[in-house]
C-alpha cells in the first residue's frame, strides 16, 4: 500500500453490494481497501474480504470492530440499512472520517442527523451512485420544465425480491427532482398506491408504482403523459458494479473536502449542464 493511496472501508462487506464495492476498490487506481466490516455475530467475521468478493486473498479480515480499525481507513462506504448507517455516522463524526452513504429508506430524523454530521465531516449522500441515473435526474428537470405543468407524471420502478424499502430511494429522488422543478412539495403530491374506486386522477399528482421480482438490479422510468403523446425517460442497471464504481469515484472526489453534505450532482458537476 502506497502512502498516497486513499484507504477505504466497506460496511456490509459480505453483502451483494459490499462485495461489488470491494471489487471496484480493487480495480480502481489510487485507492485501497483498508478495512471491511460486518454486523456483530455475522458468520462472515474472520473471513478474508478479498476471498468473499471473489478477487482472492488480500489480507484484510472482516471484523465488527470499527474502533480497532479506525487507523486503517480514511473514508467509510455504507450501503446498509438506516439504523446501522446512523450508528456508523456517529462513529465517523467522533473520529473525523468521511462517509459515502448509499443507504436508502431514512426517515426525516435520519436525514436531519446526516445534515448535522455534515457540519463536521464530508459526506456524499445519494440514493443512486450510477452516472446514468444522475444524468436522468438532470434530464427530468428539463422535461418537467417543458411538459410538467400539463402532463400526467408517473414513476415506475423495479428491483429484486430482497429489496426492503419502497418506493426505491432513486424513484423518490426522481419524484423530488420533478416536484422541485414544478414548485411542488412531493409530500403533498405523491400518490403511492391506488386501490378500489379512486376517482379521477389529480392533475398535480406524481404517481409511483413498485415492482419487486426475481433478481432485477434496478429499473426506473418516469412518464410524462399528455393526450396523444407521452415521453418516457428510463434507466436500467444490469450490474451493481455501476453503483460500486460511482461510490468509489465519489470517495476519491470527497477526499479533498473538509466537511459538507454533497450529492452526485456535485461529484459529476451536473449543475453546469
UniProtKB/Swiss-Prot annotation:
UniProt pathway annotation: Amino-acid biosynthesis; L-lysine biosynthesis via DAP pathway; (S)-tetrahydrodipicolinate from L-aspartate: step 4/4
Catalytic reactions of this protein: (S)-2,3,4,5-tetrahydrodipicolinate + NAD(+) + H2O = (2S,4S)-4-hydroxy-2,3,4,5-tetrahydrodipicolinate + NADH + H(+); (S)-2,3,4,5-tetrahydrodipicolinate + NADP(+) + H2O = (2S,4S)-4-hydroxy-2,3,4,5-tetrahydrodipicolinate + NADPH + H(+)
Pfam families, sorted: DapB_C, DapB_N
Highest rank taxon of the organism: Bacteria
Gene3D superfamilies: Dihydrodipicolinate Reductase, domain 2, NAD(P)-binding Rossmann-like Domain
SUPFAM superfamilies: Glyceraldehyde-3-phosphate dehydrogenase-like, C-terminal domain (SSF55347), NAD(P)-binding Rossmann-fold domains (SSF51735)
Keywords: Amino-acid biosynthesis, Cytoplasm, Diaminopimelate biosynthesis, Lysine biosynthesis, NAD, NADP, Oxidoreductase
Enzyme Commission identifier(s): 1.17.1.8
Subcellular localization: Cytoplasm
Binding site for NAD(+): 12-17, 38, 102-104, 126-129
Residues at which NADP(+) binds: 39
Keyword Phosphoprotein belongs to the record: no
Signal sequence segment: none
Gene Ontology BP terms: diaminopimelate biosynthetic process; lysine biosynthetic process via diaminopimelate
Subunit structure, interactors included: Homotetramer.
Classification via PANTHER family: 4-HYDROXY-TETRAHYDRODIPICOLINATE REDUCTASE 1, CHLOROPLASTIC-RELATED, DIHYDRODIPICOLINATE REDUCTASE
Family per record: Belongs to the DapB family.
Official protein name in the record: 4-hydroxy-tetrahydrodipicolinate reductase
